[in-house]
Regions:
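Short, structured secondary-structure boundary patches
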Residues: 12-13, 56, 70, 85-90
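Detector for Asparagine
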Residues: 13, 28, 75-76, 155
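Helical-face signature of the major facilitator-like transporter fold
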Residues: 25, 68, 72-76, 94
């Protein structure tokens, strides 16, 4: 079976793991600024999740996990968002997204819409029932962006 996309799994002893994680953190500093041009844009679009999802699918869970932990922290230090009370919850949800997506892609050796739907649902359900309902009610555009946008980026745009 021919793979449609090249997938990588960088390890913590490789410099490129940290370079890519740093690039994802920078992307996760810029993307929320764009999302916040729309009122409630951070809640609606969940911009940090898209970068973590794409990173986990393309470069493995370890690279994405570094970005998942440091992105909210760096954003809080520089921009004051997310707020301190939300930061740990967001970091855990992003970390679960990074690990779930990275391990699922590593196991399946492919990135499909069903796989992305599954890992996004898993990470969303961590916040409890009320938070999950709120995420789906308010943030459905962001969830759709994660699944469809992540699929297109990994399978169509980022080919190498």
């Amino acid at each position: 079976m021919e793979k449609r996309v090249r997938l990588y799994a960088f390890d913590y002893n490789e410099v490129r793991t940290y370079l890519w994680a740093a690039l994802f953190v920078v992307c996760n500093m810029a993307l929320p600024q764009v999302a916040h041009l729309v009122p409630q844009g951070g809640i609606i679009f969940a911009p940090l999740s898209l970068v973590i999802l794409v990173g986990a699918c393309k470069l493995g869970w370890k690279t994405a996990l570094l970005a998942a932990v440091f992105s909210p922290l760096v954003n809080n230090i520089i921009f004051g968002m997310p707020a301190w009370d939300v930061l740990p919850i967001m970091a855990v949800k992003l970390a679960v997204l990074a690990i779930a997506a990275g391990l699922a892609v590593q196991r399946m050796q492919d990135v499909t819409l069903w796989l992305l739907c599954s890992v996004v649902l898993i990470s969303e359900m961590l916040g409890g029932l009320a938070a999950t309902i709120a995420d789906f009610t308010i943030g459905w555009p962001g969830l759709l962006l994660q699944v469809v946008g992540g699929y297109l980026i990994v399978n169509r745009i980022w080919k190498w």
